[in-house]
């Protein structure tokens, strides 16, 4: 969805509220409770309440309003955002060594997202279901089972797409934010003293009074800004202006009113700390509030799941993850996809997390390390873009980076205190994903280099075949080639073993460009290499899925007629064996072999009819 679509600005803004702000919009369920629950050594005291409220408000202003919405969202790739997009932009005009460092940062940021995404659905849904403790305390043993049931249903409907229920997201989330604002305003009116916390000096006073403990407490404050990265990642769906408009007109005021309303309640009734969010509501409204909270957390979880699907597709298309089955669930919206393997792996991980941690307060101890780590990396990558791509003054860029890091690094460092109490979980998951992505990329490069290191010139081979042709058989043969100027392995092995060649040979390369989409005019490039050889290069963006049938259709429009069911597709199938390596490289090689065995086969990946495919095997030592 973008402003290019003929939709009104209010409609797009409403849709952005429904998708983009689910995570950060459900943070009031648990943030202030975790800040003042006593784990940091101070109770519900006036100075502590004012200090936390001031920190939360000014973090929302600085991190979300200024850093992400004003600065980072300027860095877009054809309207698209996200940490991998930022990585790609930052590396465009830098040296090879610097680019390598930026790529590593981007991959770490993407890996951190995988680590946190296991926690987000669990903590969001559990914190909503925990409202049962207020409504009916005897039902507290049902919190874990009900959370699992809700999330099971959510993961089960993914294969059907979210187009139908997605239409309900926006009105539900708008209702949610209005409820946040209403509950908070009602409490603030009863105790207006809490508005003094808008003064940033209360945050300064908080650090001066509580010293080291206040620094550690930042690990709880950061819960208020989790989901900030989603604003940038979802930029391509809604556009910059609608996302900014939604934040400043609806989301920020609602969050501020609710946090300060909880603070006003706690100043009057410190015992409300057991669940200040639900205790804001009158008794008659608790059950309706519980229902709308559950719906809001499901929507927040859906946004995160969709984000995982999008990030995975981007990583696959950029060559950082092995090919896997990607199902389009909407004929109208290319961004709506379903990846079965990712969906069920994530589901299993979320259920294990819920059963292991049992309460959202325990999960809060695991939340934040990966989020703040990504914030640090985003600051570095975005300021690199400002310097290298926008050519801003280096001293001005340095000041911006210092300002960002003065907030990001303390938040990240404070969250390291959570390492042993649960923070190891997202870090471990992120580390696994980083190893997987770097292994696939590096070993794939090693394999391709090994396969072509002794190859002859493509032009020389074609000239030789035209001069002394082998037996030619009727029809068209398509040889899939990973690189433009190399001889496809399948072609060499077909000549070696079968000693025949089709009357017409097409060397097809499917290429992923550094852009989300490629215009149809630039989709296919055709070059005739000889009277019987053609080279076809089809370009796709990383948000698009290659389709050979579409390529053939466009070839026909440009004069190279091809009929899918009358064409033979020759592909190479590599049987890999490990050569002599140091032990650590041998481990990486074994991981690559495992990934390779489970990768989606090329015919399925490019939607080629199986009965038209001929695979020629070859053994390659890596």
UniProtKB/Swiss-Prot annotation:
GO MF:
potassium ion transmembrane transporter activity; symporter activity
Q: What is its main location?
A: membrane
Question: Which positions, given as ranges, span the membrane?
Answer: 9-29, 49-69, 103-123, 137-157, 165-185, 213-233, 247-267, 276-296, 337-357, 363-383, 396-416, 419-439
Q: Which UniProt keywords apply?
A: Cell inner membrane, Cell membrane, Ion transport, Membrane, Potassium, Potassium transport, Symport, Transmembrane, Transmembrane helix, Transport
Record membrane topology: Multi-pass membrane protein
- Enzymatic reactions: K(+)(in) + H(+)(in) = K(+)(out) + H(+)(out)
> Matching InterPro entries, A to Z?
K+_transporter, K_trans_C, K_trans_N, Kup
Compartments, as annotated in UniProt = Cell inner membrane
A Pfam family that the UniProt record links to this protein: K_trans
Q: Cite a GO CC annotation.
A: plasma membrane
| HAMAP family from the UniProt entry | Kup (MF_01522)
The UniProt entry's sequence similarity note says:
Belongs to the HAK/KUP transporter (TC 2.A.72) family.
Q: What does this protein do?
A: Responsible for the low-affinity transport of potassium into the cell. Likely operates as a K(+):H(+) symporter.
Tell me the protein's name. Answer: Low affinity potassium transport system protein Kup
Q: Which organism is it from?
A: Escherichia coli O157:H7 (strain EC4115 / EHEC)
């Amino acid at each position: 969805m973008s402003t290019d679509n003929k939709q009104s600005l209010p409609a797009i803004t409403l849709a952005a509220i429904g998708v983009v702000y689910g995570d950060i919009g459900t943070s009031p369920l648990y943030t202030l409770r975790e800040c003042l629950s006593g784990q940091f050594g101070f109770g519900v005291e006036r100075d502590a309440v004012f200090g936390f409220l001031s920190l939360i408000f000014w973090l929302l202003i600085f991190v979300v309003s200024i850093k992400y919405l004003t600065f980072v969202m300027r860095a877009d790739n054809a309207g698209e955002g996200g940490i991998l997009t930022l990585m790609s932009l930052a590396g465009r005009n830098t040296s090879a060594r610097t680019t390598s460092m930026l790529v590593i940062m981007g991959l770490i940021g993407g890996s951190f997202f995988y680590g946190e995404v296991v926690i987000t659905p669990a903590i969001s849904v559990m914190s909503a279901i925990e409202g049962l403790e207020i409504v009916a305390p005897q039902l507290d043993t049902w919190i874990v089972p009900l959370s699992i049931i809700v999330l099971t249903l959510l993961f089960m409907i993914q294969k059907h797409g979210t187009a139908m229920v997605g239409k309900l997201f926006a009105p539900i989330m708008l209702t949610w934010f209005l409820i946040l604002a209403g509950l908070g305003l009602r409490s603030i009116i009863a105790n207006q003293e809490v508005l003094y916390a808008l003064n940033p000096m209360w945050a300064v006073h908080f650090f001066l009074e509580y010293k080291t403990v206040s620094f550690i407490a930042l690990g709880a404050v950061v819960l208020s800004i989790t989901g900030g990265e989603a604003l940038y990642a979802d930029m391509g769906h809604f556009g910059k202006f609608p996302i900014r408009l939604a934040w400043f007109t609806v989301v920020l005021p609602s969050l501020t009113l609710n946090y300060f309303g909880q603070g006003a309640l706690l100043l009057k009734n410190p015992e409300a700390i057991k669940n200040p969010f639900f205790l804001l509501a009158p008794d008659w409204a608790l059950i309706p509030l519980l229902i709308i909270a559950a719906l809001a957390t499901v929507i927040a979880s859906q946004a995160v799941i969709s984000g995982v699907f999008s990030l995975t597709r981007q990583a696959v298309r950029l060559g950082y993850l092995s090919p896997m089955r990607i199902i389009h669930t909407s004929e109208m919206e290319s961004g709506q996809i379903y990846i079965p393997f990712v969906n069920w792996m994530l589901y299993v991980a979320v259920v294990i997390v819920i059963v292991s941690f049992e309460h959202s307060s325990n999960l809060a101890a695991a939340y934040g390390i990966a989020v703040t780590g990504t914030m640090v990396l985003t600051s570095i990558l975005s300021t690199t873009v400002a310097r290298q791509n926008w050519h801003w003054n280096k001293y001005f860029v340095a000041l911006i980076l210092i300002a960002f890091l003065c907030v990001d690094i303390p938040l990240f460092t404070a969250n390291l205190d959570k390492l042993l109490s649960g923070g190891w979980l997202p870090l471990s998951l992120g580390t696994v994903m980083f190893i997987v992505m770097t292994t696939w990329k590096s070993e794939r490069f090693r394999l391709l280099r090994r396969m072509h290191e002794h190859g002859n010139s493509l032009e020389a081979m074609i000239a030789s075949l035209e001069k002394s042709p082998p037996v030619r058989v009727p029809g068209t043969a398509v040889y899939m080639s990973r690189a433009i100027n190399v001889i496809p392995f399948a072609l060499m092995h077909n000549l070696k073993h079968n000693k025949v060649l089709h009357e017409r040979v097409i060397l097809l390369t499917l290429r992923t460009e550094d852009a989300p989409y490629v215009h149809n005019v630039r989709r296919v490039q055709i070059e005739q290499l000889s009277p019987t050889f053609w080279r076809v290069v089809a370009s796709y963006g990383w948000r698009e899925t290659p389709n050979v049938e579409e390529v053939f259709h466009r070839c026909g429009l440009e004069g190279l007629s091809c009929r899918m069911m009358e064409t033979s597709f020759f592909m190479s199938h590599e049987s890999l064996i490990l050569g002599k390596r140091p032990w650590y490289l041998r481990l990486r090689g074994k991981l690559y072999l495992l990934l390779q065995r489970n990768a989606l086969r090329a015919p399925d990946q490019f939607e080629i009819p199986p009965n038209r495919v001929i695979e020629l095997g070859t053994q390659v030592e890596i």
